[in-house]
């Protein structure tokens, strides 16, 4: 079933789905962002960033065209060939193994199409399931950031994790 997941560019028609994700406090706490964004604000952001080469945003569809989640590469730096990775799986689709498939698809795109050198992410220390998943996908801890983000009324530590193109491309050899 995971093989039937498709990454495609975020389109204006997907904004209602994104709006629902962005207004879920639990989801946004994992992205270290403020929830409860207005739809007008989201549309403005979409219009502002639609042609921004420093970002790639994808929605995830299953074979029936149901929206499953969102995958983003942001802060793309074409000199240093690096980008930050972010992922959201809609709550009703979590726990089905989709994240692992989508992480690998995003890494494949990053390293074989964009020819990036390094992909990094930030994950809450208090989210051991996500840390473990990222480690299984080849990410390595690069640093521990103390009280980096203010979420749910308190500051939280995060791990910065990374994977290099060479490690990803040589993983099966």
Curated annotation (Swiss-Prot):
This is Spermidine N(1)-acetyltransferase. It is found in: Cytoplasm. Spermine binds at residues 28, 33, 41, 49-52, 84-86. Keywords: Acyltransferase, Cytoplasm, Magnesium, Metal-binding, Transferase. One of its GO terms (cellular component) is cytoplasm. Allosterically regulated by polyamines. Polyamines trigger conformational changes and induce the symmetric closed dodecameric state of the protein when they bind to their allosteric sites. It comes from Vibrio cholerae serotype O1 (strain ATCC 39315 / El Tor Inaba N16961). Its main location: cytoplasm. The active site is at residue 134. The lineage of its organism: Bacteria, Pseudomonadati, Pseudomonadota, Gammaproteobacteria, Vibrionales. Residues 5-162 form the N-acetyltransferase domain. The keyword Acyltransferase applies.
């Amino acid at each position: 079933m995971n093989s039937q997941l498709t990454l495609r560019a975020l389109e204006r028609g997907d904004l209602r789905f994104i709006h629902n994700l962005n207004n879920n406090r639990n989801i946004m706490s994992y992205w270290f962002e403020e929830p409860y964004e207005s739809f007008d604000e989201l549309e403005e952001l979409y219009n502002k960033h639609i042609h921004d080469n420093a970002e790639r945003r994808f929605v995830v569809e299953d074979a029936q065209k149901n929206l499953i989640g969102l995958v983003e590469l942001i802060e793309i730096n074409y000199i240093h060939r690096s980008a930050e990775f972010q992922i959201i799986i809609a709550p009703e689709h979590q726990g089905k193994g989709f994240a692992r498939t989508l992480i690998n698809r995003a890494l494949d795109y990053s390293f074989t199409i964009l020819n990036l050198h390094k992909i990094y992410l930030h994950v809450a220390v208090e989210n051991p399931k996500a840390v473990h998943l990222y480690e299984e996908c080849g990410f390595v801890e690069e640093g521990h950031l103390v009280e980096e983000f203010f979420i749910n009324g308190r500051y939280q530590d995060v791990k910065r994790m990374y994977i290099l193109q060479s490690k990803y491309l040589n993983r099966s050899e």
